[in-house]
Every structure is written in structure tokens, then in C-alpha cells.
């Protein structure tokens, strides 16, 4: 090793530093080369093609979107996922419980706070059958809707006919005692 300092080029032999527009061009060229080396440009082009049309520089809520995506976004924003899912189950009731049971038992309402699905049957025999199948049915509903959506299946028998007036009506009575089918 020698104690002599390294030779530095003299200031008069330096290349001139770019300024203004030239400096901007040099910086842009360097940024493009670095992005190309990382692969960002190709990735951005793929994302632009996938993303579709946009209304401005960034994607926002006003951009065009598919109807299904817009409905899903609305359900998520309003917190309607569970009621919408239960409504879907009420529409798909025959596929979930089977054709025989669906002919005789119909879902009436869903209490979101208590997570109780109320089902009405057209005879006491079918109501008893559904009460026996309730644990399996709750498990199947939770499998379709998400865990814990339905905690209890409330089974109601058939509604008796309303007999408020007529020759067989006793004044002050509470109605028919046993008219279940």
C-alpha cells in the first residue's frame, strides 16, 4: 500500500450535469429501466386489463362494475349478509330439506337477534317429524349459511281455523280446543 492519495479527475474534465428538462428525461429513463428490471410494468398492464374501466387516476366507488359485484358490495356495506343468506335458504327450501318435507313444512320467518328460524307444518305429524330432524337440519343450514347463523329451529303446528262468529260459538270461549290435523 502506498501513502499517495488516489488520483481524482480534474474539474475541467468532468461531464456537464444535466439540468431542467434533460434531468427529468434522465430520471424518467432510469425509473423505467428499474421498473422493467423488477417486472412492475408488465404487472401493471395485466392489472389494468383485469381492472377494466376506471373513472379517474385511481379506482373508486364510482367505477363501472358488474351487477353481482355491486349487489354484494351493497350487502356487505349494509351488513345484510345473514338476512340475505337466510332469504336464499327460504327460496331453496326444497333443495335443503328434501321434496317430501318441503311439501308439508314451510319456513315462516327468521329472527336475526335470536338466530331462530320458525317453520310451520301443515299437520301435527309433520311437525313432530321435523322436531325429530331439527338438530340435523340446523347443522345443514349452518353448513350452507355459515357457522352459528341458525341456533334454533322453532317448529309450529298447523294454525286452527278462526271461529269467532257463528252458531257453534259459545260467548266468552277462547276458540277451538283441538282442531289440529
Swiss-Prot record:
Top-rank taxon, per record? Bacteria
What this protein is called in its record is: UPF0232 protein SAV_4320
Bias (Basic and acidic residues) occurs at: 30-39
Which InterPro entries did the record assign?
A: DciA-like (IPR007922), UPF0232_actinobac (IPR023007)
Give the residue ranges for region: Disordered.
Answer: 1-64, 156-181
Q: Which residues form the signal peptide?
A: none
Q: Which intervals carry biased composition (Polar residues)?
A: 1-10
Q: Which family, according to the similarity comment?
A: Belongs to the UPF0232 family.
Which HAMAP family does the entry link to? UPF0232 (MF_00630)
Amino acid at each position: 500500500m502506498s501513502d499517495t492519495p488516489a488520483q481524482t479527475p480534474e474539474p475541467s474534465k468532468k461531464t456537464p450535469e444535466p439540468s431542467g428538462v434533460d434531468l427529468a428525461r434522465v430520471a424518467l429513463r432510469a425509473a423505467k429501466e428499474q421498473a422493467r428490471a423488477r417486472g412492475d410494468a408488465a404487472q401493471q398492464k395485466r392489472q389494468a386489463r383485469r381492472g377494466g374501466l376506471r373513472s379517474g387516476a385511481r379506482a373508486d366507488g364510482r367505477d363501472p362494475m358488474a351487477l353481482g359485484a355491486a349487489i354484494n358490495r351493497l350487502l356487505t356495506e349494509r351488513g345484510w349478509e345473514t338476512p340475505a343468506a337466510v332469504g336464499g335458504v327460504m327460496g331453496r327450501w326444497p333443495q335443503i330439506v328434501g321434496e317430501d318435507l318441503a311439501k308439508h313444512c314451510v319456513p315462516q320467518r327468521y329472527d336475526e337477534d335470536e338466530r331462530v328460524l320458525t317453520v310451520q307444518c301443515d299437520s301435527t305429524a309433520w311437525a313432530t317429524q321435523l322436531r325429530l330432524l331439527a338438530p340435523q337440519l340446523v347443522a345443514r343450514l349452518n353448513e350452507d349459511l355459515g357457522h352459528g347463523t341458525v341456533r334454533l329451529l322453532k317448529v309450529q303446528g298447523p294454525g286452527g281455523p278462526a271461529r269467532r262468529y257463528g252458531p257453534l260459538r259459545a260467548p266468552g270461549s277462547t276458540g277451538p280446543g283441538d282442531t289440529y290435523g
